[in-house]
Amino acid sequence: HGSGLDHRSWALQSRWFAFHGFSVFAPDLPGHSLSEGNPIKSIEGMGQWLVKALKVAGCESIHLVGHSQGFLVALEAASSLGVKLKTLTAVASALSIPVNDSLVETAKKSPEDGADMLLKWGFGSHSRSGISAVPGMQPIGIGRQIMSSNPLAVDLVACTRYINGIECAKNIQI
């Protein structure tokens, strides 16, 4: 999942894949929503945690999908999965994600304000009304609640410090 987010980011996609024959594993990183423990402060550490979680879950044929920070974590994990890795998919990501200093500082001082900044940028000007084309859904409100209760600043700093994307990508053989 992306910075400050959790498994709910993948609710609709998880459902689709599950109904099309895939076993879906969409974990919350430690310190995020339903996961216990302290937040992991580096993308490398998050990738190692994911590899261990996949092993504990008994995953053998692995298709990794990651959004933003989640792709960096998936990339780290993918570089050490070997033949178990079947595909790796990036959604709105890159091999490095330097985060604006103002956003990081805002998220450190006020997770709510940091979440608001990300949501405004992510959803654009039409998000100001807070409505959704999907009945019963309020992605801005839901996103604000999730991000402000998770370690957003820790995640943003981890993204900023991550520099191993190219090397990890070179190690992946699918």
Show the residue positions of the predicted features.
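Active-site glycine-rich loops that stabilize anionic/oxyanionic intermediates
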Residues: 2-5, 68
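Alpha/beta-hydrolase active-site loop signature
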Residues: 4, 29-33, 95
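Anionic, Ser/Thr-rich low-complexity intrinsically disordered regions
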Residues: 5-8, 49, 91
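Active-site loop/oxyanion-hole signature of alpha/beta-hydrolase fold enzymes
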Residues: 11-19, 23-69
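Conserved loop-alpha-helix segment in the C-terminal half of the alpha/beta-hydrolase fold
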Residues: 18, 171-174
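Active-site acidic short loop of glycosyltransferases
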Residues: 58-61, 83, 173-174
